[in-house]
Amino acid sequence: KWIVKEHEIDRMAGWFGSPRGLLVIVSSRFIPASRVPTFVTAGILRLGLPRLSLLLFAAALVWTPVLMLLGSTLGPPFMEQFPRYKQYAAWIVLGLFAFIWFFTHWVVPAMTWRGRREIVMKVRGLMQPSLWPGWILYLPVRLGIVLLSLRHRRLTAFASANPALGRVGGFIGDAKSLLLRPFQRDSRCCPTLALSLEDTQEERVKDAAAFAACHGFPVVFKPEVAEDGAGLRFVHTQEQLERLVRGAQEDFLLQKFIPGFEFEVVWRRNPGKDDGRIMALVHKHDVTVRGDGEQTLEELIWLDEVAVSRANLFLRCHARDLNRVIPAGQKVTLNLTGSYGHGARCRHRADLTTVELDAAVTQFAKRFPGLHFARFDLRANSMEDLKAGRFIVTEVGGCCHVSSLLRDESLRFSRSYAAVWGQLKACLEAGAYNLRQKVRPVPFEELMARWSQARGRHDEFAVSEEL
């Protein structure tokens, strides 16, 4: 609920008492417009008044003579030159701000080990397209959806690829339980219980308890409408489950926890034909660090060459344990789910696509006769099980749920975009075919309402309300 958690304030309070934090207080005497924010922050983080006063007094003793000397020495020459450069004042001020920003964000951090690791993270975030923010990375994809839809003379043509699947063909924002419902009788579909706010609170608690008793803990708690793991919880006890169910402000579902490796499969069927094939398979890798008995979890994150690329995310996910020294040999998984949004790595694994897997996924997809394009989240005990076609489906996505190939840094950018573009074309072709068969088009307003509901969420389960 709050932007800043209490345990985060405690962690930052410790930092403010460190030499680096004390240096910030001293430097506020020298940087214009920084004193008031520094004083307020020091108060919020409970820095003692005697220490704060002593630091400011020492800074004043250093700064005041220097300021007076600079004013008396450089003041008269500056005032003589001021009229000549007055017309460039705006550019000079902008340049000064740019210099200050560059100095504080790049030069100052480079003076410490952690700062240099932060620079590594920043440089990778700029240079590796797979690490770009989603709104930038997927902008060409969204423009492609619009352009291809206009080519088929209907802006929502893609939503007709899967008639009667969910409310909007399985597009972003469709209810998860509705997309899973056609497949529930298949043993390869993860056991799921949908609970609506239309039911009474006691009914929801009773049904949830019965589900947990049947399938055991942990169970997975998910909002009906969410993307990229937003709002997801792993529930380990009956007390946690009851608290979540009673506090729910939206429809949600419970799922049996399925261990094993996690994969993402994009599947298509050619319009008007009884076929089907896998277009892409992505393996969701865990990001792990191993303790040495000396380093804290935060230090291990900054040390690891993989984890450092998304260090800020992992620091938020594990905010409570950052100062804990990890015992030697103990492995810590940094991503808390298989979602990229929670830190998992995405790897294209075309070598895992076998004839058996292709046939098994196609057989599963045909449980819903109108399905032409879908993305399935799979769990398998091993790579061999997956290649043999033995898996459990935990989620189903419909139209325009393209694969996470763009998040695979090992692929050339042009290759991953070409693959995603091919998936979009397959989805649009199916939608256009169904429209020619007189399928009712999905209203644009309903499509946008669903999309905005899913994208409007800001709760990342790893840093949201505590359990």
Where are these predicted regions, by residue range?
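C-terminal active-site "lid" helix and adjoining low-complexity regulatory extension at the edge
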Residues: 381-467
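ATP-binding N-terminal substructure of ATP-dependent carboxylate-amine bond-forming enzymes
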Residues: 95, 99, 103-186, 197-206
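Transmembrane alpha-helical segments of integral membrane proteins
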Residues: 65-77
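ATP-dependent carboxylate/phosphate-activation module, predominantly the ATP-grasp catalytic core
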Residues: 268-367, 397, 402-427
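Membrane-interfacial helix-loop-helix
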Residues: 1-47, 51, 75-92, 105-114
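Hydrophobic residues within alpha-helical transmembrane segments
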Residues: 27-31, 54, 58, 62, ...
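A short glycine-rich, hydrophobically flanked beta-strand micro-motif that places a catalytic Asp/Glu
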Residues: 256, 263-266, 371-385
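Active-site nucleotide/adenylate-binding loops and adjacent lid/helix of ATP-dependent enzymes
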Residues: 50, 164-165, 175-312, 354-358
